[in-house]
Amino acid sequence: MKAVVVKGHKQGYEVREVQDPKPASGEVIIKVRRAALCYRDLLQLQGFYPRMKYPVVLGHEVVGEILEVGEGVTGFSPGDRVISLLYAPDGTCHYCRQGEEAYCHSRLGYSEELDGFFSEMAKVKVTSLVKVPTRASDEGAVMVPCVTGMVYRGLRRANLREGETVLVTGASGGVGIHALQVAKAMGARVVGVTTSEEKASIVGKYADRVIVGSKFSEEAKKEDINVVIDTVGTPTFDESLKSLWMGGRIVQIGNVDPTQSYQLRLGYTILKDIAIIGHASATRRDAEGALKLTAEGKIRPVVAGTVHLEEIDKGYEMLKDKHKVGKVLLTT
């Protein structure tokens, strides 16, 4: 089968033939129906993920159909449509038993220690699998592992209450445009921030209010902002912090430039009673919650474009294109 393989540390990737996967005990083989490109891929290719073991198949977001199940697999059968979490938990530890699989000490990451999903077929551990409801499209389901499920968990950890106001930075990006929808589906009023007048009208389809510009805190403070979902990182963090009303929470998802740092003013966070929540992974519970909202039509996938596996270069060009809105998907 064909796959996108990262050859080594900072050595780029290539599309090449690899052996078809075979399931070991506790594993399944899926046919990849959709995968998704992510800014994290670019950071991995730049060498910012030290746990990567090479060569490795790239890609960590997938929806697929089970073709074959290995020994000991229960609850899943050939023909089931599934997504995978971003990682494989052991399923037995203290955290896994509490439903906090993201904290599992033994977790292994797809496209890091384990082969990812930019391939025609993929091997997935059963502890990672979540069934997709019939009414959820492939496009909506593939958004769950690294986008809608992740945002769902972030807002749950922020104890979002119905009627609160959520501000989303990078609101036209692949994460941001869906974060607006997740927050609204969870009962919030939503404010989207974008730096592009061109994209403001699109963001406005999903947000109650749109702010255009990199300096947005003063405009944001015209109402009480209770939660910020920061999908960008250091370039927007200061404005995000200043946007919050007392008792506010920042859910920090983005980190577009890992080489940059931010000097946090502790007194500011103390006096305003602000909580900063770092966040990167959904659990099974969160994935199921996001899938339910997707199946109900409360979250609609926004797709910037779709490319074939062998057009991966074109896909990354689209991902970097500042004029695109939404996620770039991959088919095989």
Swiss-Prot record:
Write out the residues that bind Zn(2+) 2: D90, C93, C96, C104
> What SUPFAM superfamilies has UniProt attached to this entry?
GroES-like (SSF50129), NAD(P)-binding Rossmann-fold domains (SSF51735)
Q: Tell me the subunit arrangement.
A: Monomer.
| Entry's Gene Ontology cellular component terms | cytoplasm
Entries under Pfam families matching the protein: ADH_N (PF08240), ADH_zinc_N (PF00107)
Function text? Plays a role in autotrophic carbon fixation via the 3-hydroxypropionate/4-hydroxybutyrate cycle. Catalyzes the acryloyl-CoA dependent NADPH oxidation and formation of propionyl-CoA.
Q: Where does NADP(+) bind?
A: Y39, S172, G173, G174, V175, T194, T195, S196
Q: Which family does it belong to?
A: Belongs to the zinc-containing alcohol dehydrogenase family.
Record: residues binding Zn(2+) 1: C38, H60, C146
GO molecular function ontology, one term from the record: zinc ion binding
Keywords in alphabetical order, please. Metal-binding, NADP, Oxidoreductase, Zinc
Enzymatic class = oxidoreductase
Name this polypeptide is given: Acryloyl-coenzyme A reductase
- Keyword Zinc annotated: yes
What does the record give as EC number? 1.3.1.84
Catalytic activity field: propanoyl-CoA + NADP(+) = acryloyl-CoA + NADPH + H(+)
**Metal-binding recorded as keyword:** yes
Recorded superkingdom: Archaea
PROSITE patterns per record: ADH_ZINC (PS00059), QOR_ZETA_CRYSTAL (PS01162)
**Entry's transmembrane regions:** none
The cofactors it requires, by name, are:
Zn(2+)
